[in-house]
Every structure is written in C-alpha cells, then in structure tokens.
Design a protein with these regions (language model features):
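Sec/Tat-exported extracytoplasmic proteins
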Residues: 74, 100, 105, 115, ...
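Solvent-exposed, polar/charged alpha-helical surfaces in well-ordered, non-transmembrane soluble domains
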Residues: 72, 94, 98, 112, ...
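Pocket-lining segment of extracytoplasmic ligand-binding domains
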Residues: 109, 183-184, 189-274
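N-terminal secretory signal peptides
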Residues: 1-16, 25-34, 43
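Secondary-structure end/capping motifs
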Residues: 243-321
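Hinge/cleft segment of the Venus flytrap/periplasmic-binding protein
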Residues: 322-330
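Short, glycine-/small- and polar/acidic-enriched structural segments
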Residues: 44-176, 182-185, 201-207, 222, ...
C-alpha cells in the first residue's frame, strides 16, 4: 500500500477544486480478508471507541445490522458500532470523505470517482462478482429491443455508481459511444419516477431496485452485466482508520463473511428479514438475493487490475479528472 499519489492526480482531500468536483458529482447522483489488513501500518491516529459504518438500503450490511452480532463481538474490545444509511455508493463515499463514516461497502465504480476526487481510503475486501444483479431496462411496451437502439435516447442512472461502468461497456459492445446517448443523472428513487413517467427511455439500475422494476413495472432487461462487467461489491475504509484499527476491521469482515455464509443458504429467511427494513416484498427480494455474490474475499492483483481498467475507461471518457493509480488505495 503506497502513500504516494500518481503524479497526474492531486489526492489531498482538502484541495478545494477536488472537493468541489466531488460534491458536484455526488449532487448529480442519488478471517478471509486478513491479507490486505495484515499489511496495514499501525502509525495513524483514529477513534478506537467506535466504528461508523456506511450502508445502503439493501445488502449484507443490513442483515448484519439487524442481527447485532458485530456489536456483540466489538463490545469486548470497547468499540461501539454506529450505522449511517446512504442512498448509493457515491454519496456513501462523500460521507467517508467528510469524516462521517469509517468504513462502507460500494460497487466497483464509486471508488474510482472517489479516488479521483482525492478521497483517502483503502480497499479491504470484496464480494464475488454478481453480473446479473444490474441491468439496463426499458418499459414492457418500449420499442427499444437492444442496446444499439439507445442511440440518441435518454438513459437514467446514478452517476459514478456501479451501473455507470455497465452502461459504458454495454454501449461499447453494441458499437456505440458514450456520447451517442443522453445520460440523465438521477438517484434510484428519482430515476424510477422518471422511468415510470416516461421522461427517460431506459434505466440502468442494480438490485433490489432492478428486481422491483421487473416484478412491479414489468421492466424488460435489454442487457445485464453478463459478459460485460463483474459487478463486484467492495469494502472500503478510511486510510487512517484502517491503519490505526486493523483488528476492528478484521472483526467486521469476519462477521460479514459469517452473515454471507448464512444468507447464501437461507435466502427465504433473509428476504423475510429484509422486507420490512427495505420496504419491498419478500418474493422480490428473493429474486435479487439469488443473483447476489456471497463471501468476503481478499483484494488480489487481478482485482486491482480490473479496477484500473475502470479508472482508465473513465479517464479516457474525461468523466474523472486526469489519471489515477488504483494500487495506491490498496
């Protein structure tokens, strides 16, 4: 893990231009992993009395929060757990940049935008790929039958989220450029409203919003991540917190992995538990859960290379300022 930024990227969080860029981007939006933690230096300062976790409305963090096993485990270390909810990954990382949280889980694209904006974090683990858990959808009566027919169309999605990369790769696969569509940057809730009102022609979204759109609206998938992207969920921590409290993060990932292993074999139970928490019926959640990846994995060289490809793609499209080196956040 290197503290030296890439020469083309100013990574000082206090840099006003980068902070302004990050706020602008966010406003437009809505024991397996011990390897990386074992290498973390123990020199940085941090708050050892609490672990502030950023989470989204759906996922294993929601189950972990409901079960309370992490709180019980960390109580013996004198660490209190606090949970803060965010609408999507980019906003969660804005919270990490502001010092509101210490750790969170996001898709594969938010870390790229965040690192480009100077957010000081490290990757501490990831989930297996879940390419079917995100897709480009249209309304059931839409004349659009494939991605190639999105030329000139309005496509809604959360800028800087995992589906942003899916859209770029799907367009590329269909022979289109990003400039060939009209990107409409909306949070999931606003994007769904625009989709229903036919203010946009297509919507790029992830589970469980995807499953809900399919079951409730009859949304038709014209492309998902299969053969295009991995759709990997990453666990990120503020660099200073990770350096000062690796044992706390080890406990977190251990408990997440335990929840994952249980959830993989108890999908109906997880769906029933999540239903009142996320406001979706259990059958819809079961659809989403069956497409998810389970089990915490360590960050590998292959993982870093994949993330670097995403960074290079967005740099080429000039969607992030300059170039960055993903490995510096390892």
């Amino acid at each position: 893990m290197s503290d030296t930024p890439h020469a083309d990227v100013e990574t000082t969080p206090a840099n006003p231009r980068r902070r302004q860029w990050l706020h602008g981007a966010a406003a437009g939006l809505a024991g397996l992993a011990l390897g990386p933690l074992a290498t973390l230096p123990a020199r940085a300062q941090g708050n050892g009395t609490r672990l502030r976790i950023g989470f989204q409305k759906y996922g294993n963090f929601v189950v972990l929060k409901a079960r309370g096993t992490l709180e019980k485990r960390l109580a013996s270390q004198g660490v209190a757990v606090q949970w803060l909810e965010f609408p999507a990954g980019p906003q969660l990382l804005e919270g990490l940049n502001a010092g509101a949280i210490d750790v969170g889980t996001v898709g594969e694209t938010p870390p790229i935008f965040a690192q480009a904006a100077g957010v000081d974090f490290v990757y501490i683990g990831n989930e297996p790929p879940a390419p079917q858990g995100e897709a480009i959808v249209v309304l059931p009566d839409s004349p659009i039958r494939n991605v190639a027919q999105l030329r000139g169309k309005k496509v809604a999605f959360n800028k800087g989220s995992n589906v942003h990369y899916l859209l770029v790769k799907a367009l590329e696969h269909a022979g289109l450029a990003y400039a060939d569509i009209q990107p409409i940057y909306l949070t999931p809730a606003d994007a769904r409203a625009a989709f229903v009102q036919r203010s946009v022609d297509a919507w790029v979204i992830w589970d469980p919003y995807l499953a809900a759109a399919e079951r409730q609206l009859g949304a038709r998938v014209i492309a998902n991540g299969e053969g295009l992207v991995r759709n990997t969920q990453y666990y990120l921590a503020a660099r200073k917190y990770a350096a000062a409290h690796p044992q706390v993060l080890r406990a977190l990932l251990d408990e997440v992995d335990a929840v994952d292993r249980w959830a993989r074999d108890h999908t109906p139970d997880v769906a029933a538990q999540l239903s009142p928490l996320v406001g979706l019926d259990a059958p819809t959640l079961e659809v989403a859960l069956k497409r998810a990846g389970y089990g915490v994995q360590p960050i590998t060289d292959a993982t870093v290379a994949y993330q670097q490809n995403i960074a290079d793609t967005f740099s080429t499209l000039k969607l992030i300022p300059g170039k960055l080196t993903v490995a510096s956040a390892r």
